[in-house]
Amino acid sequence: MCIRDSGSTGQIGSELTMKLRSIYNGNIVAGYIPGAEPKGELKESGPSAIVDITNEQQIAETVSKYNIDTIYNLAALLSAVAEAKPQLAWKIGMGGLFNVLEVAREMGCAVFTPSSIGVFGNNTPKDKTPQDTIRNPRTMYGVTKVSGELLSDYYHIRFGVDTRSVRFPGLISYVTPPGGGTTDYAVDIYYSAVKGEKFECPIAADTFMDMMYMPDGLRAAIEIMEANPDKLIHRNSFNIASMSFDPEIICNNIKKYMPDFHMEYKVDPLRQAIAESWPNSLDDTCAREEWGWKPEYDLDSMTQDMLAKLKVRFNK
C-alpha cells in the first residue's frame, strides 16, 4: 500500500502523515505546496512531493510515480479563513476535490476527504444531530463540505470510486498550533493556560460545539479506510462524536489542574455566528454500528494529556 496525503503540512495532515507512516512503515507520500515544505521528522521520515491540488496533471503524475492506491485529500481552508477568502476556498475545496476524484477514477485509487460539522446549518436539529438530516450551511466552508460529500458519493455510485469520509468535530491538538478555525479557541485556551496567560475567548458562554482530541480524529480517519466496505451503508460522510462543551465547561476543567487560570470573553462576531449555526452535539450511531467507531478520550482525559504535553513543549 502507498498513500498520498495532500495538505500534509496542515493542521490535520502533519499529524496524520506521521500516524500513517507509523502504521504503514513510512510508505506515505507527503503532498505539499511551495512554501509549506515538510520539516524535521515529517521531512525525514518518508518521501514528499510538491502537489498543487488545483493541478490534475500534477496529482496524476505523483500517483503514477509512487504507485499510490489511497489518497488522503486534506487540502482546504479553515472555516473563518474560508469566509475571508470564499473564492479561494471553493477553488481549493471543490476544484481540488474534483481533480483528486478524476485521478482516482482513472487510476483506481481510494479517496478519503474529511468533512465537518460545518455541513450543518441553523435549521438543522441542534442536539444529537442525526446522521441523515438537513444540510444547508451559510458559510463557504460548509458549502464546500456539503458539495464535497455529494460529489464523493456521486463518484462512488457512478464510477465505483472507493470514497469515504467522516464529519470531524473541532479537533484539539498539542502538536499543531491553531490556525483560524471556529473551534480553535479550544486549542488556544490550553496554550494560554500552560504559558500562564489570561485567555480572551472569542466564543460566547453557552455556545456548545462538538469537539474531539486529535488522536481520536486520526484514528477515525484511518479506521474508516480500513473498514469492511460491505458493511458501509453510508460513505460520505459519517458523524463521529467524542465530547461537547462550551467555553465555561472547558475553562473549569482546566482550573481543576491549574486553579490560577483566568479567562475573559472577547467575542469575535464572525466566529460566533459560525459557531451558532453548528450543532451542539452529534449522533454518531451509524459510525459505531457500521465500522465500530468509539472514541477513547473524554474532556477530562484530554485536558490532562494536553496540559502534560504542552508543559513539556514549553518547559513549564
Name these PLM-found stretches.
Residues 1-3, 247:
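Short, small-residue-biased leader/transition segments that mark boundaries at the very start
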Residues 53-92:
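NAD(P)H-binding glycine-rich loop region in Rossmannoid oxidoreductase-like domains
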Residues 134, 165-178, 188-212, 216:
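A conserved pocket-lining segment of Rossmann-fold NAD(P)-dependent short-chain dehydrogenase/reductase
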Residues 4-23:
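N-terminal Rossmann NAD(P)H-binding glycine-rich loop of SDR-like oxidoreductase domains
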Residues 116, 150-175:
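Conserved beta-loop-beta element that borders a ligand/cofactor-binding pocket
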Residues 73, 98-140:
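Conserved Rossmann-fold NAD(P)-dependent oxidoreductase catalytic core, especially the SDR/UDP-sugar
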Residues 146, 159, 172-187, 214-215, ...:
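Glycine/proline-rich active-site loop of Rossmann-fold NAD(P)-dependent oxidoreductases
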Residues 202-204, 209-316:
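C-terminal substrate-binding subdomain of Rossmann-fold SDR/epimerase-dehydratase oxidoreductases
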